Design a protein with these regions (language model features):
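Short, surface-exposed connector motifs at secondary-structure boundaries
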Residues: 30, 108-114, 174-179, 250-254, ...
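Short gly/pro/ser/thr-enriched loop/turn and capping motifs at secondary-structure boundaries
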Residues: 66-70, 148-150, 212-215, 286-288
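Hydrophobic faces of well-ordered beta-strands that scaffold small-molecule active sites
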Residues: 36-39, 59-61, 114-118, 141-143, ...
């Protein structure tokens, strides 16, 4: 991305480059010291060997189910132009093992909000995980509604208004923590899904999840992934994420965690300008584990260059076309 031309309209009347930036944000009543979190599926405790995770605004876990999930057969990762396909299959240790083995290490980091991402194969499974995690000291729950509904022939929960509403409502009833609903981009009208989640009791939204894609090896004449299809992530989907965040911000008054191809501080600022309150970093962290911290530093630089003193000020400064 390139720095805007100097003759572009300035969104701020003045700035003080020496003033300390206010990077804090509040998502559904939970204060983050800055707007950067990890995207679900891309963070493990091994990141502690690469950087101080306490510098993050929040940490988002891998998907947590009622019982361990083995994940899909290999190969389940494939590179593409502008990103990658993954069909890991939400492999996880199950909620009891996660609570016993991983939560204490995260909880030991002072001032770091923990967002527990939950997955399920039925509405009842989602509700059970939400209820169990609500008994712990996680700070927020993120509902991944891109999982296939085994009772409805494998249709993803998040691709119909009815599925979004029913799943969100059930989890909202079971959860005693602020609830973020993670929206799928594999829909015709994402604003309809956002409204359904809001109507069912979501406290915040996160978007976008991965786009469904496929890769074929033309010389072997075989589909690359054992699962055939996978979720496309990386810089290639970033413009789609920006567009969807922009649309959802104008349709629903809930806080938004924007994600999708965030590789730089400029990418993060772009999502905030589109209407996100916070930003999740995913694929970039798979390439270099400390990417979230680098992107946070770059976001500071962008804000100073354009004169935004706070994340809120940046979010409210988009110059719309005449």
């Amino acid at each position: 991305m390139h720095e805007p031309a100097q003759n572009n309209p300035a969104p701020f009347h003045s700035s003080d480059s020496g003033k300390e930036l206010d990077l804090s944000v509040e998502i559904a009543g939970v204060r983050w010291k800055n707007p950067i979190t990890t995207a679900s599926g891309t963070f493990t405790l091994n990141a502690r060997a690469c950087y101080d995770i306490g510098r993050l605004g929040a940490v988002t876990t891998k998907g947590i189910a009622t019982v361990p999930w083995p994940g899909n057969k290999t190969p389940r990762i494939a590179e593409t132009y502008g990103g990658m396909l993954n069909a890991v299959g939400l492999q996880n240790v199950g909620m009891e093992a996660w609570i016993r083995d991983e939560l204490p290490a995260l909880r030991s980091v002072p001032g770091l909000p923990i967002i527990a991402n939950i997955v399920g194969k039925t509405v009842e499974e989602y509700a059970a995980v939400a209820a169990r995690l609500s008994e712990t000291d996680v700070d927020m729950i993120e509902l991944n509604i891109s999982c296939p509904n085994v009772k409805e022939g494998g249709i993803a929960f998040g691709t119909t208004v009815e599925g979004v509403y029913a799943t969100t409502a059930a989890v909202r009833k079971a959860a005693k923590k602020p609830l973020i609903v993670k929206l799928s981009p594999n829909v015709t009208q994402i604003c309809d899904m956002a409204k359904a989640a809001a109507d069912a009791g979501a406290d915040a939204l996160s978007l976008i999840n991965t786009l469904l894609g496929m890769k074929i090896d033309v010389y072997r004449r075989k589909v690359v992934l054992a699962n055939k299809t996978g979720g496309l992530s990386g810089p290639g989907i970033h413009p789609i994420a920006v567009r969807m965040v922009y649309e959802v911000r104008r349709a629903v008054p809930l806080p938004i965690v924007g994600m999708g191809g965030v590789m730089s501080g400029e990418d993060a600022a772009e999502l905030i300008l589109a209407g996100a309150d916070a930003v999740a970093v995913g694929t970039a962290a798979l390439l270099t584990p400390d990417a979230p911290i680098r992107i946070l530093g770059e976001l500071r630089t962008v804000m100073r260059k354009i004169g935004a003193a706070s994340v809120r000020e940046l979010k409210n400064s988009l110059v719309e076309p005449a």
